[in-house]
Amino acid sequence: MYSSSNSFLGGVNNARPGQPPFMQQPPYSQLPQGQQQIPQQTGFQPQPTGYGSQSASHLQPQPTGFPTGQLQPQFTGFPGAAPPQQQQQFGGYQAPAQQPQLTGYPPQSQPPSLQVPSTTGLPTRLAPRTSSEIANSFSDGAGVAPPPPPKSSGSKIPNIRLSFITAQDQAKFEQLFKSAVGDSQTMDGEKAKELLLRSRLPGSELSKIWVLSDTTKSGQLFFPEFALAMYLCNLRITGRELPSTLPDKIKNEVSGMVDIISFGVPDTEPQGAARTNVPSFDAPLLENKSAPPAPQHPKPQQPSNAQFLSQLAAQPTGFGPQATGLQPNQPSLLGANATLAPQTTGFPGQSQQQYLHSQPTGLMTNPQATGYNGPRPPLPPMPTGFGSNLSSMQTGGLAAQPTGIPGQWGFVNAPSSGLPNIEALKQQLMPQPGREGGFTTAGLSGNASIPWAITKEEKKIYDDLFRAWDGLHKGFIGGDTAIEIMGQSGLDRKDLERIWTLADPNNRGRLNMDEFAVAMHLIYRKLNGYPVPNRLPPELIPPSTRNLNDSIGAVKSLLSQDAESRKASGAFLQPQKTGVSYLKEHSFRGGARSPGFGRKDATLFKNNDEAAAGYRSSARRRVGNDARPSSPPTSQASEEELSVEQLKKKIRETQIMLDAVDFKDENRAEEDEVLDRRDRLEAESLMDRTRRVQDDIDTHPNAVFRKLDNGAERRSLRRQLQAFEDQVPQIASEVRRIEREIADAKLELFRLKDAKAHPNSAANIVGTGPGGTVTEADRIKARARARMQARAAELAGRPVPASVDDDGAAVRRLEAESASIRADREKNEAMTRDVEESVREFTRSLEDSLKEEGETSTREHERRRWEDALGVEDVIRDFIYDLQRGSRTAHIRKEEESRASAQEQRLRHEEPSPGVSRLSPAPSAGSAGSLPGSTHEDRVAAARERAQRRIAERMAAAGLKPHTDTSETLLQRQEREKREREERLRRAEEEDAKREQERQRRLAEEQRSTSDTPAKPVGKKPPPAPPSRRGRTDSAGQAEVKKAAEETITAEQAAREQAIREEQQAQEEETNRLEMEAQKREEELLKEKEAQEARLRALEEQVRQGKIRKQEEKRRKEEAERLAKEKEAALAAQRAEIERAKERERQLQLELERLDEESSSDDEGPVNITPEDSTPTQSQLLPTVTPAAPVSAPESEQAGSPEDTSSQAPPVDFKLETESKNPYFKITHQATDTQVVSSPPVPQPSFTSPKADVHSTNPFHRLAKQETSKPAFTGSAPLERKSRARPEADDDWSAAGSEFDSSDDDDDERPGGGSAKQLASILFGTMAPPRPLSAMDDKSPSKSSTPVQDSPVASLPVPESNGSLSAPAAPPPPPPPPPAAVPSYDPSVAPPPPPAPPMAPPAPPPGPPPPPGPPPPPAPPAASGPPTPAGAPDRSALLASIQKGKGLRKVQTNDRSTSSIAGRVLD
């Protein structure tokens, strides 16, 4: 219940207005009232006597004197003495009156009446009582009734908004607080605990919350503290941590509101007791140290404070000091002259029923009922009596007593000087927007004790207010402003008039700083309940006014005294001739007896008229408007005449002084020059370092990413963002409109479906009402129509139609569907709103990111100064412009170099391709990837450009308009970019030239303006050494020099100011012009961008239309090609049959000859066996053979052949080729390969030197190179048509061809072993390759190797070619992997996919690849009969066949069918 054992001690003095401190009751003696002792305090805290350490219904007895037993010792008198026996007190509580208390020794009998008390200890000196004590003694009689208690008023909570909680929460907390405390202003600890426990938080958390909330440490909560506790509970409930200490903002708000509530409590002191300005607690200042402290006179308890005391911790009322006296006949431990007499305590003349009863002193055996009957907290012992050297005083454990005003209660957080209200007053009176509204004094008024004098803190606050309102620093505040300021205090006009009169004693109509402070202090006092004085107190008179008034008064008194003395002495009539001077007696420093006597002041001044002869005016020596030089002071020595020697001596001394001054000036000028030189060197070195750093920045690789014009880019992005944001509402409205249309369409669709499902339903009724609604008339008509239909059906014998559904079913179905549609629409609408909200949030985030971060006025000024060269000197401006020009030049140069290097690299990769294709017909050399040193990216880029060029050519041949971008060649693009760079350079040079012209113009204007002035401006040059003044003593010359120098300086300043103004104007104009130009450029760029986007859209549309037309033409061409291929296939089949018959006949003849010649067959046997065995094996194991290519690669590297790179690159290129889905692209590659191979057959042997021979030994390696070279070449239709005309050459086969065929037959014979069946199969199997279809891909030596491995596996390339939509040139594309998978895929070759119809027709006539019966369609393209046996297995046979050239001729001859097919596809 009690916060501590001493808490109620401190609370008594404040919680009980009008009650004196505990244990301080005035004594009563037989002496008259005038001889009573003055109330004195010893400086120690008041401490009660006689309470035990335990709390019970009755207090335990506590003796005073020596400690015996369990009670604490309390000894009387001097600290060194102690009574022989103990006294015992019994205390109990009985409210509101106190029972009598008996003190003393047992033998004494105490009369019921009051006895005369005597002070213990040494005899005290009596002192007269104060007037307040005398006045209070009359009102302490028993007949005086206590004043009526003040009316109870409910708890008043200031209308102040707490920032850390919401307005709704604050209103709820106010209601809860009022319901809990009733009329009180605070909530006790138990009630607060009960409320806080409802939060179900652990006790440790609630303990922390209580410690943070109880800011006053009083064990009770004011409303702001209660609201803070609720706020902290909410923080902990929501999972957030409690702060270790309250934030300053929250702490200030809570303490300020607590102070307002505390000061707003009405004063409970009796109305009749008038208070003085001097607080009663200043008594220690008047204390007489030699006299013992006199207890203060008690004041009656005011029962009206019970309502407040009920809300606070129970605190006992104070007793008067119990002076325990010794009997006179008992030996005193204090000495013979220190006998103590018994004394009574209590009020004299009061009845037993009112307040304290008389307490006779008596024996120890008599019980002494004291104080309370209720439980009391333990109190520490306190020695009574007086001693000058008290050292055993126990003061530990006492809490600090808060200050307050009698009549108030509770703990008040009031500062030692001033009150928090003054801060509120300052905030109220500070100039702020909207102050013209109504004024309120909420939180300003109070009843604080405010002295007349102004403290330093208050003066500082008033001075801050004055400076805040004195914006122009006039030093005073006018009447209008003062009315506005003082009107905000809310005082009456009469009070403000009186305050103004007191503050402005001189009636000037304005207030200076001191007078304003006086006015504010008077307002502050008035707000705290003090009346406005009629005259200004001396403490409030400003020091300046007081000193001035004192000085004026002193002068007046001096004048009056002087006049009286002159009148008395007769000097008043003729003061000049009296010869007596009274000036020394009239000094302000106190006259002749003052310590400063002898020093002259204004009272001792006397004008010397005789010295006027030595005065020489300098007015006639003034030149121009120069200021008048000070006249040489007249000295007393000028009256004396100097001798010639003295004059010469003075001249010499003056000359020496002038020489010294000249020397100093020269040294100073030299030092300045040295400093200037050093500064210039440092500036130049700094500029050089800056240039180097700028060059490093410009030449850094990442300098391209540096944003030079970040602001312009931000502005353009903000404009784009705004444009997009403006489109959002339009798009949202379109979406909503479409949603409505969809909903209407769904509803209409449902009506139609419902009408179909329920023909006779009422939903089929056509509404004629507004908006198509069905009316009752429409339903009646529908029912009548239905009855007519039913009757007609009965008459006609038809079945009666189903009964019409009731209207409710149709309506219900329609409503259900409408509800579902509406739900979908609402869902979509919610999604649309979510999208809009997300777009808005995204837009806000983008706007925040695009804002000028950190852009302040200072930063903008610095940027304009150091980037735009505004407001700097000419040298710095030129330096900044040079840096900017160098940066722009470096940026443009770097762009040109990067583009030039990129173009050179592109050209270097593009130029070798056509050269190689022209030099070598070999497919391996026709690709950019075959060049030594070329990378994969270069090869891909070159192939892409060639493909684009070929596509453009094909589109042009097909009559399609090519894309504008593709039509622009590399040279044209380079030319265009070069022109653009030149244009940018030209614009940059023009801007630089304009800036230079502007700068030159400003310099010329400055020179012109300075030339007009009489003196030449010094500029930046160091000042020259001052001229020597030796031999020049004329003061007129000095004046002229000085005047000329000042005129020069004035002219320089004027010229410089004019130049600065002109420069600023020019800079502003230049800045505006640049901004306008930048804006125009941005607008032009935006327009160009829009136009470019429009052109791109148009071109994309053209390309799309072109593609569509191209696809249509392609389909038509494919159809025509298919028909042509079918015809050609039939013709080819017929020609093949004829040729097969011829070959069969020729082979039979050769076989007969071989049978006769065994030796020749034996020699040829091994050759035949090897190809026959190896060919199928290789065809099946083609993937495993492919790794053998690197084996030949090192050989080629050692030989230095350029095909080394191509041997490694083919797989990658082949992958690109196989992934391509463009049939034209593949056909072009195949046609190009055939063209390249067939065009130069004759130079082949010469080109394939030993290197080529060595390289061609590996057929798979050649195959890979062939496939690699294919993607890079494109064939043309004319060559294919030419190849289609070659079939007739097959009929005219030469002897060389027969020899080649015979060699093939020999090769095929060996596997047969001489059997007729095997021979026939070999003969028929070898007939397929000679077909014209097979010779297409075998024109080049590299091709000859490919057919070799393809002859047995003729079907392998065909499926691959069909699958990839390539023409007869399909065999090359499949590298190692395809062959292995082809045999399984071979059966499907007969029905090839639609993209490869050309290959399908040739397939049926021949048959399967390896078997002789049905030569597969792919066999012709993939494998040529003659080269097959000679090339794949046996390298020597392959080389022999290549060197002969006859096989090549035969292959070229058989290219007709294949080329014709390809030509048709391409056309």
UniProtKB/Swiss-Prot annotation:
GO molecular function annotations of the record: actin binding; calcium ion binding
Q: Which Gene3D superfamilies match?
A: EF-hand
Specify the EH domain's residue ranges: 169-257, 458-547
Which residue stretches, if any, does this entry annotate as coiled coil? 634-758, 965-1162
Q: Where is the composition biased (Low complexity)?
A: 25-48, 77-101, 919-934, 1183-1197
The segment(s) forming the EF-hand domain are 201-236, 491-526
The record's keywords, sorted A to Z, are: Actin-binding, Cell membrane, Coiled coil, Cytoplasm, Cytoskeleton, Endocytosis, Endosome, Membrane, Repeat
Keyword tRNA processing, does the record have it? no
- Quick one: signal sequence residues? none
Ranges annotated as biased composition (Pro residues): 292-301, 1369-1381, 1389-1430
List all Polar residues biased stretches. Answer: 50-75, 129-139, 305-314, 340-370, 1171-1182
Comp. bias (Acidic residues): 1154-1165
Stretches for region Disordered: 1-157, 266-376, 613-643, 822-864, 888-1087, 1101-1467
Q: Name one GO biological process term.
A: endocytosis
Q: Which residues form the WH2 domain?
A: 1434-1451
The protein's location, in the record's own words, is: Cell membrane; Endosome membrane; Cytoplasm, Cytoskeleton, Actin patch
Feature: compositional bias, Basic and acidic residues: 892-912, 935-953, 973-1009, 1054-1087, 1101-1129, 1136-1153, 1279-1288
Membrane topology field: Peripheral membrane protein
Protein purpose: Component of the PAN1 actin cytoskeleton-regulatory complex required for the internalization of endosomes during actin-coupled endocytosis. The complex links the site of endocytosis to the cell membrane-associated actin cytoskeleton. Mediates uptake of external molecules and vacuolar degradation of plasma membrane proteins. Plays a role in the proper organization of the cell membrane-associated actin cytoskeleton and promotes its destabilization.
Give the family per the record. Belongs to the PAN1 family.
**Assembly, per entry:** Component of the PAN1 actin cytoskeleton-regulatory complex.
State the protein's name.
Actin cytoskeleton-regulatory complex protein pan1
Recorded source organism is Aspergillus fumigatus (strain CBS 144.89 / FGSC A1163 / CEA10)
Underlying gene = pan1
